[in-house]
């Protein structure tokens, strides 16, 4: 009998004590816990938590326009768009899309936190999904006291020729003004094949959190064609 199947695996290599490279081939996510079913009665997409180890490790590096707790000041959820949402890679409506190969570089290089990721997914006839390449680049630096600034860029390309390409890029910052007052801001833009205009998003936000009181003020603008797809 002929052997039918594919060989896959993961390799982790510490380039320096603070910088790690990960390589993956024919990634197997078969053992990942299944998402709980939820009923969505709104026009907005549901965002399920990431459960795959490959994307969980070093995930804080890839946060954009968010503090360490996921929001500027730890308040409730904001309508801030996700410039990078890892579950868009290798999943389609909860169904697994095979990842042929990929690599990731995360850690610290001098004063900078860096994150690089490139993954190639396979086509899936059953879900009409085309083979797609995903790239994410993140650079962040701590400044002043418990503050940070950074830039990020993502690219999703259905073909090497660029057909079906979506690019997103932006800059963000979070600033601790006092022990109780935090400010955050970002600007981002997307470029999608066949779509023009009204493709920017930006935000300014203040969070005040004291022992007994808290408040927040926010200005958020999201263009009708702003559409990060990674």
Task: Locate each region found by the language model.
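Residue-level signature of outer-membrane beta-barrel architecture
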Residues: 13, 107-109, 140-143, 175, ...
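Repeated loop/turn-to-beta-strand initiation elements of outer-membrane beta-barrel proteins
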Residues: 19-21, 111-116, 144-150, 179-185, ...
